[in-house]
UniProtKB/Swiss-Prot annotation:
The keyword Iron applies. This is Probable cyclic nucleotide phosphodiesterase SynWH7803_1390. Its EC number is 3.1.4.-. Its cofactor is Fe(2+). It comes from Synechococcus sp. (strain WH7803). InterPro entries: Calcineurin-like_PHP_ApaH, CNP_phosphodiesterase-III, Metallo-depent_PP-like. Fe cation 1 binds at residues 9, 11, 49, 198. Fe cation 2 binds at residues 49, 86, 157, 196. GO terms for molecular function: 3',5'-cyclic-AMP phosphodiesterase activity; metal ion binding; nucleotide binding. The keyword Repeat does not apply. Pfam families: Metallophos. Keywords: Hydrolase, Iron, Metal-binding, Nucleotide-binding. Belongs to the cyclic nucleotide phosphodiesterase class-III family.
Length: 265
């Protein structure tokens, strides 16, 4: 039973003491990593907006924070994946992190599950796009997963469907309908994870009742929620934990923790 934890939208910057929206991005990301690793995940995923200022130093800061958290927690082997958001520089993200970890587009396998990490970054814009090349790559990976008898989680930054917030829906995934039409044709696809919206969100990919759409809170700051927070903590940082079962079902729960900041190292 692989365990997956999703974190999203840390918005790190080059300076360790740098603040974004009035908060210490690094300190709050360090706390999120500690919370995540306490749950002993097999897979740890960061779904975009990794580096707010898109600097080389910011991605080094991200890499060092993850390395330090793993060492401090004496964590068991965990596979890490990252995807680029609108506040990212995909080439720098890959250059700094890609030697050791999976950077979108990429594949992460755990037991009878396959995690497909996709980039929705579009240069110069806040909205996202998958594009024909990645859609073709996705279908190739899904065909292989079906052959291998694996269930599939797909992860990206931008929500592939409207979430019910007018301002957010204008900067969602421009080819989201095309992506979802493709994914719904593959019975093995059971979950689509995304960030960008800085809040908990949960839905289904109709008419598929077995295909969940899950939006993740930010580790930095929350936006006004569309849906009630099931934990009653809509304004706290958070993440999402998913236990991926052998029968293709998913047991997931929202994670929240205090916004109290640690001293940045």
């Amino acid at each position: 039973m692989p365990r997956l934890i999703q974190l999203s939208d840390p918005h790190l910057v080059a300076r360790a003491e740098g603040r974004v929206r009035g908060r210490s991005a690094l300190s709050l990301f360090q706390k999120a990593l500690a919370q995540a690793l306490q749950e002993q995940p097999d897979l740890l995923l960061v779904t975009g907006d990794c580096c707010h200022d898109e600097t080389w130093c910011g991605y080094v800061r991200l890499r060092d924070a993850v390395d330090a958290a793993i060492q401090q927690q004496a964590a068991r082997t965990v596979c890490l994946g990252f995807t680029a958001g609108n506040h990212d520089h995909p080439q720098r993200l890959r250059a700094v992190l890609g030697r050791h970890w999976v950077v979108a587009p990429g594949v992460m396998d755990a037991g009878c599950w396959r995690l497909l990490v996709v980039s929705s970054h579009r240069a110069g814009g806040c909205a996202g796009v998958i594009g024909g090349v990645q859609l073709s790559w996705l279908n190739t990976q899904l065909r292989e997963a079906e052959t291998l008898g694996k269930f599939v989680v797909v992860a990206l930054h931008h929500p592939p469907v409207p979430i019910g917030d007018a301002s957010m829906d204008t900067i969602g995934l421009s080819d989201g309908e095309q992506l979802m039409d493709s994914l719904k044709r593959w019975p093995a696809v059971r979950v689509v994870l995304f960030g960008h919206i800085h809040q908990h969100w949960k839905g289904m990919a109709a008419p598929r009742s077995d295909l969940s759409l899950l939006g993740c809170p930010s580790t930095l700051v929350s936006f006004h929620p569309v849906q009630p927070c099931p934990l009653g903590r809509a304004w706290d940082p958070g993440g999402r934990l998913l236990d991926l079962m052998e029968d293709g079902s998913v047991q997931e729960r929202l994670m929240r923790w205090s916004a109290c900041e640690q001293a940045a190292g």
